[in-house]
């Protein structure tokens, strides 16, 4: 929500703003696989503490940027530090949850993040309205929350359930053995040649390509193209994130239920196969309607349906990755963030060349369809290294 004010204050063109948005996701993508290895090697307690403290500091530093180059560097460093949050989270779920709970857990985690983002959109609009567009204050305020979270997480969390004093014997039996700790070298060849892994990477590229329209350009689209005032734009910028929160949580819950009924292969596939084509149609309809409110509602609904493949995708990574879940989730998220890198650049260049949102929105619809096609070939029972000598534990629940 602060981006249009930052852009105006620093005198950035749409193409430059697209590069700023993409600097974050490019760094995130580049450092995601190493960060996933670190999550497997050093554990999520230390990893997630480091990630959140880093991004909190970079949030504050964003507020003191003075031009294009300084902002570009800060956002690149921001993305480099934030890389690893989801691989770290995957290790938490691999060690702390039974297999048939993981889709729901990922859905809830992403849902709460999206709800936080939705609240932030409206809160940012209020701060900007009350401070005459002081975007620097916004970044300073938000940096404090992460520092508090990092301290609480490091104090409270333990890498293993058995190390936590509040976990009883019954809970340990329910959790079971989970996934093993990383043993030996990562089977890199298997990671990059496994068919399910390749298709998961393609699927996530398309989903996050669309996701980043809503995270980066949506406020400007509402303000400049659809003619909303600042407070109304704040509400309508919230709406896609709320729909995404509902969609990702609902799909995670549905996927776990489907796994229990039809097995992992189709239980992980079905939500994305249903939601992504609907999302593509809704985005196409939004681009062609003249009514501003109708377009905003259609985009929000499309954003929600597009998330149907997110939680099942992360759960499939845990099931495919086993003891190397951090590396596998990091690999998928790398390709997702390459999509997130492409979208702001494409939109910025299209605005520069044609001053139109039609092409960017059509590419979002296309990649949603592409992601749906990828889901047809994703098999969550196809574990990496299955033909190699490696220990595989905890595959039995719900695997068919």
Regions picked out by a protein language model, each given a short descriptive name:
Residues 74-113:
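Cytoplasmic helix-loop-helix junction between adjacent transmembrane helices
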Residues 30-69:
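Conserved MFS/SLC helix-loop-helix module at the cytosolic interface between two early adjacent transmembrane helices
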Residues 46-61, 266-284:
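Structural signature of the two symmetry-related core transmembrane helices
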Residues 109-164:
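Helix-loop-helix hairpin linking two adjacent transmembrane segments in secondary transporters
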Residues 103-122, 128-129, 244-248, 333-343:
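Glycine-rich segments within core transmembrane alpha-helices of 12-TM secondary carriers
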Residues 194-251, 310, 314, 318, ...:
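Extracytoplasmic gate region of multi-pass secondary transporters
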Residues 129-144, 229, 267-270, 349-367:
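A membrane-interface helix-boundary motif in multi-pass transporters
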